[in-house]
Regions:
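Secondary-structure edge/capping motif, primarily at the C-terminal ends of alpha-helices
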Residues: 64, 81, 139-143
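Helix-turn-helix
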Residues: 1-19
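Amphipathic alpha-helical packing segments from all-alpha helical-bundle domains
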Residues: 51, 65-78, 82-112
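A short secondary-structure junction motif
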Residues: 23-27, 31, 67, 84, ...
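Hydrophobic/aromatic-rich alpha-helical bundle segments in the mid-to-C-terminal region
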Residues: 89, 97, 110-160
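C-terminal alpha-helix
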Residues: 106, 157-168
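Amphipathic alpha-helical linker/stalk segments
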Residues: 16-56
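Amphipathic alpha-helical segments that line or abut small-molecule/effector binding pockets
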Residues: 43-66, 71-79, 122, 126, ...
Length: 168
């Protein structure tokens, strides 16, 4: 039935990818973080607060763990990364190195405002983003709504603790 509306599997994938990207831009704007990469809008990265980044990441976690389309897209992309270099590059851009670089650039700008000595922006970004990915995987591993909510709450607390530790 889907092929009545789409040419092929790739067309379906591209439409889902565009949808996911569009929602990401909306969440970025709503949270007050840049909706593009640092290279496209470096000035916007210098005006992001810890609260804005924290809220954005909490929204991202909810989205990637609760939205059925996003969950299925992420799982499909995870499998497809092993089938072609193009899908591997997209997986990295969407779920691994892309978010890590984005967060590193934000934390680099935020670190400039801090008086205390902080780890490198790269080390901070790894510390900040790793629990996102780990807890997302844990959420994938259960069908129990209560367990999923406990995992989400752990992530929310982690974000608050991270900013308390480094940016308070």
């Amino acid at each position: 039935a889907l092929y009545k509306h789409y040419k092929n599997k790739r067309d379906i994938f591209n439409c889902i990818f565009e949808y996911v990207c569009r929602l990401d831009v909306e969440r970025s704007r709503k949270s007050g973080v840049p909706e593009q990469d640092y290279s496209d809008m470096p000035e916007a990265f210098s005006h992001v607060s810890a609260k804005s980044l924290g809220n954005y990441m909490k929204e991202q976690f909810r989205y990637w763990s609760e939205d059925e389309i996003a969950c299925n897209f992420r799982k499909m992309l995870t499998l497809e990364q092993y089938k072609s270099p193009e899908m591997s590059a997209l997986y990295q851009k969407v779920l691994v190195s892309g978010p890590l670089e984005y967060i590193e650039n934000l934390l680099c700008e935020m670190s400039k405002e801090q008086e205390k000595l902080l780890p490198s922006p790269h080390a901070l970004a790894i510390e900040f983003y790793s629990p996102f990915y780990l807890l997302l995987s844990m959420s994938d591993g259960t069908d129990c709504k209560e367990t999923k909510e406990e995992i989400a709450q752990r992530y929310m607390r982690y974000i608050d603790d991270f900013f308390q530790k480094y940016f308070s």
